[in-house]
């Protein structure tokens, strides 16, 4: 290769590297934004799950009390 071809090839490689660097920063910014959005969604889902846990426990407690009342009625009927 002569010197001119080497310079042209070097310029093309350098230009490609610079363009790739710019697009990578934009992609990194987009990915960072996506991660923040997903983190917020995970936090919201975690809060929803915690709220459901307390609702489920309340429903279990109500069911246990209802079963106890039924057991008491059945034992009174059998006496």
Swiss-Prot record:
A GO cellular component entry from the record: cell outer membrane
Annotated InterPro entries: Lipoprotein_leucine-zipper_dom, MOM_Lpp
Induction: This gene is probably poorly expressed.
Role this protein plays: A highly abundant outer membrane lipoprotein that controls the distance between the inner and outer membranes. The only protein known to be covalently linked to the peptidoglycan network (PGN). Also non-covalently binds the PGN. The link between the cell outer membrane and PGN contributes to maintenance of the structural and functional integrity of the cell envelope, and maintains the correct distance between the PGN and the outer membrane.
Protein name per its UniProtKB record: Major outer membrane lipoprotein Lpp 2
Residues annotated with N6-murein peptidoglycan lysine modification: 79
One Gene Ontology MF term: peptidoglycan binding
Lipid attachment residues per UniProt (N-palmitoyl cysteine): 22
Subcellular compartments: Cell outer membrane; Secreted, Cell wall
Signal peptide range in chain numbering: 1-21
Entries under SUPFAM superfamilies matching the protein: Outer membrane lipoprotein
Gene Ontology BP annotations: lipid modification; periplasmic space organization
Keywords annotated in UniProt: Cell outer membrane, Cell wall, Coiled coil, Lipoprotein, Membrane, Palmitate, Peptidoglycan-anchor, Repeat, Secreted, Signal
